[in-house]
Design a protein with these regions (language model features):
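Hydrophobic alpha-helical transmembrane segments of membrane transport and translocation systems
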Residues: 80-158
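Alpha-helical transmembrane segments and their immediate interhelical loop/hinge regions
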Residues: 1-72, 76-82
């Protein structure tokens, strides 16, 4: 049982680290793209989205709406263009970067990260999205260790 607790602690710590790395990547993507496209408040929006992205899935959306209204005060046309930029960057982040970065940090293949977020979100909402990635990772790791031990016992080591 001690092994399970140590494993869960290590995986949850890695998950938090992965979330932070992913948030910095997303904020940087917004800062760079907004600077290139000459949007107002690029640095502020990048930092805002980085902080709100710590909340899985919906955090970026919250940051987007705050940034949208901020940009709307300066330029309504750029605010609408910002929504398009947000959709593009959010798709890249949600489908490519998030599963790879967070999955890599907890030792879970990207497809299982998407399964964990979907399952956790459907069962327990936002809290489930936070809890299910480390939980599925612990189960995945324990199952993998059990399979490897059985294969080793039968001298069928991969």
């Amino acid at each position: 049982m001690e092994h399970v607790w140590k494993l869960a602690n290590r995986i949850f710590s890695s998950f938090i680290t992965g979330q932070c790395i992913e948030a910095v990547i997303l904020g940087s993507m917004f800062f760079v793209s907004m600077t290139i496209l000459r949007f107002p408040y690029a640095m502020l929006v990048g930092i805002l989205i980085a902080f709100t992205a710590l909340i899985p899935v919906f955090g970026g959306i919250i940051g987007c709406w705050v940034a949208f209204f901020l940009i709307l005060m300066v330029s309504p046309v750029k605010a609408v263009l910002f929504l398009g930029l947000f959709l593009i960057l959010q798709q890249i982040e949600g489908n490519l970067i998030y599963p790879h970065v967070v999955g890599g940090s907890v030792g879970l293949p990207s497809i299982w990260v998407l399964v964990a977020v979907t399952l956790g979100g459907s069962l327990m909402g936002i809290v489930g999205m936070l809890i299910f990635i480390p939980l599925i990772s612990v189960i995945y790791t324990l199952f993998r260790e059990w399979v490897y031990a059985r294969l080793e016992k039968k001298q069928l080591v991969l």
